[in-house]
Every structure is written in structure tokens, then in C-alpha cells.
Regions:
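Conserved, mostly hydrophobic/aromatic
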Residues: 52, 261, 327
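Active-site-facing alpha/beta catalytic cores
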Residues: 66, 79-244, 265-266, 270, ...
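N- or domain-start disorder-to-order transition segments that initiate the globular core
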Residues: 1-41
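Acidic (Asp/Glu)-rich catalytic clusters
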Residues: 40-43, 70-77, 125-130, 213, ...
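Internal helix-turn-beta structural module
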Residues: 304-342
């Protein structure tokens, strides 16, 4: 019933000094951030595809996967902006299990937060260097932002974190597109209140300092489905869900109303192959309604080199050790399909 203080963590400035981003890649990130911002604000009609492994567990296979997206991005550049998922923190429903490379650089060894912060930054830098694509990550721990704020072009706040005040206030200081997921209950009001909070300025304590933020106008919602009080999954990507969200957004004092649809989690019931059908349904609904087309700015898809998932210790290259993912061939075909549907 007490804390044992194990190690003093390096500061963000120390980690960034030891693992810097080159001037060329800083410029690349600036350009990518601007493109993504223009999609969220409605200045660019391209569509966002945030795609990658459930959790970024292995630097080699994750960077291999991300590099494969480079050619596809070139092929679909007129229709899509691909944002690789490099999720270095894994929220756990019960608190048990693999919590991501930022906590546990080697899934088969004990946690090591110091090495984890280094592994997190190194993986993101390598992914950008090898692919030319800046990535997305989930900000499970708000205090980690400083270690990657110069690397990420998209941030997600998860279903279990979205009601937390510190997460909301911290996002108000981010300068990149940030998606607030609906809570596991599915309550749209909670999700929209988190967007309102993050879009407005705040005065609070962050990493031992008193800080002030200006608000993040690029904060938006992510629909990931829900779990009922009886433990059943319910979906929230259907036509009527999106119209309801559009109408609720209209009553909020927020700017840039936008939504990303998470095709996995409770929307698919974790039946990973359903992501293909769900993605196509969302794109079809965008064709049916100008309101939905204006609202839905992208899809979030869980995908890796090998489909499905595996137990830790099986060592199948490019296969998820957490939630099951689409395999590469299905993912590639789906991205091209999304590009074609966005053009209609």
C-alpha cells in the first residue's frame, strides 16, 4: 500500500537531445501537420486513413509495415492522407497484460520505463526516416507528450481516458489533430464535452509546472462503438448514428466538427475482418448524405503484416500480440478501395 520510487526518468529535453529529429524531417512533419489540419478544417477534401498495428510491439516489424505504406500513399495521394498507427502505449481493461513498448520495451521482460521512453522515440523517428510518413499514437499518459511532441501528426485519446480532466486539459495544449474517442458506455455527450474542453484554453498543473494553454481547434471525435451494461457490444458507425452526431455537434460551441470512425474495437466486436465491411459502409454513407460527408473525415483501421494475433513468445514476425488485425494484403486492397470510394 505504498510507492517505491525506482528510477528518475530523463526529461523530454534530455531524450530529444540524445535522439534528435533532423531539420529535413522537422520540415516534413510541418507539411504533414498542415495537410491533416486542412482535412479536419474542411479546406482539403482528401480523406484520412489512420492504419497500423493494435500495438507497436517490435521496432523492426512496425517500421517494415509503415514503410510498405509509402508506395500506397504515393498512389492515392490525390484522395487519401495515410497516417500510420504507431501505438506505443496499450490501455488494459483490468490493468494486467502488455502495456506497450513505452512501458515494456521487450514484452518478455520486466517493465523498464527509462528504456521504454527511448524505445518509443527511436521507433517513431525510424518510422518517419524510412517511410516519409509522420505517425499517430495514443496519449495514454499525458505526461509523455513532451517526449514525442515533435514527432506525431495525430494523437488519440482512448475510451477509458476521455472523461479524465488531465487528458482533456493536456490536449488543449497540443498543436496537432487530436481524436477523442467515445467512452466505453458510448455516451456521445461525454465525448463531445471532451472536445469542448480540449478546444478551449485552460490553466493547470502539468509536469510540475503551472501552465496555460490556448485550446486545440483540431480536436474532434472518434467513434469506436460501445459496451452495454450487460456486456454486449453496440455499433455507432451507422447512418443514423452519424446523423445524430452531426445534429449534436451543431448545438455545441465548438469549431471544425469532425469525426473519425474506428472500424475495430466495439464497432466490429473485435471481429477484425469486419473492418473491411464497416469501412465500405461508412464510405457509402458519405455518398448518401452531404452532412455525413462533411462530418466524417477519416477511418481508423487495425492492420499489420500478418492477420490475426498471437500469444507473446510465439515470435511470428509482423503479427499482433494484442488485438487481432487485418493482414497486409487485405489492408492494401482496402486502402485502394477507400481511395476509389472517396473519389465518387
Amino acid at each position: 500500500m505504498s510507492f517505491t520510487f525506482l528510477n528518475q526518468l530523463p526529461t523530454p529535453d534530455e531524450i530529444k537531445r540524445d535522439y534528435p529529429l533532423s531539420p529535413e524531417l522537422k520540415e516534413l512533419k510541418k507539411q504533414r501537420d498542415a495537410m491533416i489540419s486542412n482535412v479536419i478544417t474542411g479546406k482539403d477534401s482528401r480523406f484520412l486513413v489512420i492504419i497500423g498495428p493494435c500495438s507497436a510491439d517490435n521496432e523492426d516489424s512496425v517500421c517494415d509495415y509503415v514503410s510498405r505504406l509509402t508506395k500506397i500513399q504515393e498512389d492515392v495521394k490525390d484522395q487519401l492522407i495515410i497516417i500510420p498507427r504507431v501505438y506505443t502505449n496499450k490501455p488494459r481493461t483490468t490493468g494486467e497484460g502488455y502495456k506497450g513498448i513505452a512501458s515494456q520495451p521487450d514484452p518478455e521482460k520486466a517493465p523498464d520505463m527509462v528504456e521504454g521512453l527511448i524505445a518509443m522515440r527511436k521507433m517513431h523517428i525510424r518510422a518517419i526516416e524510412e517511410s516519409g510518413l509522420t505517425c499517430a499514437d495514443e496519449m495514454l499518459y499525458p505526461e509523455n507528450w513532451g517526449y514525442v511532441e515533435d514527432l506525431l501528426s495525430y494523437v488519440a485519446i482512448g475510451a477509458r481516458s476521455v472523461e479524465d480532466q488531465q487528458h482533456r486539459l493536456t490536449v488543449s495544449g497540443f498543436d496537432v489533430a487530436s481524436g477523442m474517442k467515445n467512452p466505453t458506455s458510448g455516451d456521445f455527450s461525454v465525448m463531445l464535452n471532451s472536445v469542448y474542453a480540449a478546444q478551449h484554453p485552460h490553466h493547470f498543473v502539468y509536469r510540475g509546472s503551472e501552465v496555460q494553454t490556448t485550446g486545440n481547434p483540431l480536436t474532434h471525435v472518434v467513434l469506436r462503438g460501445a459496451v452495454s451494461k450487460h456486456g454486449n457490444t453496440t455499433q455507432n458507425y451507422h447512418y443514423e448514428d452519424l446523423i445524430r452526431l452531426h445534429d449534436m455537434y451543431a448545438k455545441m460551441d465548438v469549431v471544425n466538427p469532425a469525426a473519425i470512425i474506428d472500424t475495430n474495437h466495439s464497432n466490429s466486436g473485435k471481429k477484425f475482418k469486419e473492418q473491411i465491411r464497416i469501412a465500405r459502409e461508412v464510405m457509402h454513407n458519405r455518398q448518401l448524405s452531404s452532412d455525413i460527408r462533411g462530418l466524417v473525415k477519416g477511418l481508423m483501421i487495425e492492420s499489420y503484416i500478418e492477420e490475426g494475433n498471437q500469444s507473446i513468445g510465439n515470435h511470428i514476425y509482423g503479427k499482433s500480440i494484442t488485438d487481432p488485425c487485418l493482414g497486409w494484403e487485405d489492408s492494401k486492397r482496402l486502402i485502394y478501395d477507400i481511395a476509389e470510394l472517396n473519389a465518387k
